[in-house]
Each structure stands twice: as structure tokens, then as C-alpha cells.
Swiss-Prot record:
GO cellular component, one term: cytoplasm
Top-rank lineage group of the source organism: Bacteria
Protein's UniProt name: Elongation factor P
Residues that bear N6-(3,6-diaminohexanoyl)-5-hydroxylysine: 34
Pathway: Protein biosynthesis; polypeptide chain elongation
Length: 189
């Protein structure tokens, strides 16, 4: 199995700790005036999403996580699982609700998303950074409403609630940043 030395640590590197795959979020090299140098890292568990702080002695080596990140197409959902397809091989893989997590409120059937595979199981799903969705419920816009000031909540076709300008109505298609949940503008039709 491949290993990484602490001097190879950088953000985004996938490593194994305590039998689970983790990704390094932050890495800081610390060289105290007295004593051995070490790396202070923040790591995110790819299965649960929890973030931990760990320290590693300088020169220590850690096993590399055998994870694969790939683009897959979301197909459908049943009672227990979400199903994704590899667009090159047409292989379909199920994902548990825990793996989909917050991506659920942005996904529509046929959407391309980034999926992390570990032991041929989907452990994490990331929606596209920007999506275009139709507004299915919002308060009606009134005369004199402008894009400046305020805003109102709007429910999208996937169930996500986004704060939008007052002039938007039911049926309008908008562009949203899925990382922050922010309204970016009307969709170009």
C-alpha cells in the first residue's frame, strides 16, 4: 500500500486513519524552539463528514486512502438508496442516504455530480457547484419591487429554500450556488 510522509501533506490529500478514509482540510508545519517538529492537521472523515484535529511527528508516514473521485449521473431514488450511473461504463451503483446527505436538496434526475468511491461503495456525493432550478413556491412579487433591498424565500423544485429578490415569481428558473445556497441570477433561456 502507498504511504505519504508528513512533508507531503497538503490540502485535499486522501489518507487512512483508524481504518477510515480521511481528506486533509488544513495542514500546518510547526517547528518549536525546543523539541521535534510536527504537523498540525485538520482532517475530514469521508464517511461521516466529521472534522478532527490530529498531529503527526515530522517524518511519520501515513497510509494513502484508496478512494476514487469520479463524475457520475444521478438516476433515481427508492425507499432506501439513491442510484448513480458511470456515464462511460453505464454501471449503476447505489448510495445510502448518509452518503448523499446535503446534496439531496440540489439533485434532479439526470444531473452530473462528483462521487467518492471507497471499496466500490459510494461514501460521498457532491452536487455541481452551480445548478439551474425552477421556483415552485414563493410569495407573489408586488409592483415596485426592485432587485435592491430585501428578498424573500423561494422553494425550488428539489425542495431547497433559497433567498431571492422580490421581483421573481413562481415558474421562474434561477441559477444557484450549491456550496453556499445563494441566488446568483436568472437562468439564461
Amino acid at each position: 500500500m502507498a504511504t505519504f510522509s508528513t512533508n507531503e501533506f497538503r490540502g485535499g490529500l486522501k489518507i487512512m486513519l483508524d481504518g477510515d478514509p480521511y481528506t486533509i482540510v488544513e495542514n500546518e508545519f510547526v517547528k518549536p524552539g525546543k523539541g521535534q517538529a510536527f504537523n498540525r492537521t485538520k482532517v475530514r472523515n469521508l464517511k461521516t463528514g466529521r472534522v478532527l484535529e490530529r498531529t503527526f511527528k515530522s517524518g511519520e508516514s501515513v497510509e494513502a486512502a484508496d478512494v476514487l473521485e469520479m463524475n457520475m449521473q444521478y438516476l433515481y431514488k427508492d425507499e432506501d438508496n439513491w442510484y448513480f450511473m458511470n456515464p462511460e461504463t453505464f454501471e449503476q451503483l447505489p448510495a445510502a442516504q448518509a452518503a448523499v446527505a446535503d446534496a439531496e436538496k440540489w439533485l434532479l434526475e439526470q444531473d452530473e455530480c462528483t462521487v467518492v468511491l471507497w471499496n466500490n461503495n459510494i461514501i460521498s456525493v457532491t452536487p455541481p457547484n452551480f445548478v439551474e432550478r425552477k421556483i415552485v413556491d414563493t410569495d407573489p412579487g408586488l409592483r415596485g419591487d426592485t432587485s435592491g433591498g430585501g428578498g424573500k424565500p423561494a422553494t425550488l423544485e428539489t425542495g431547497a429554500v433559497v433567498r431571492v429578490p422580490l421581483f421573481l415569481n413562481i415558474g421562474d428558473t434561477i441559477k444557484v450556488d450549491t456550496r453556499s445556497g445563494e441566488y446568483l441570477g436568472r437562468a439564461k433561456e
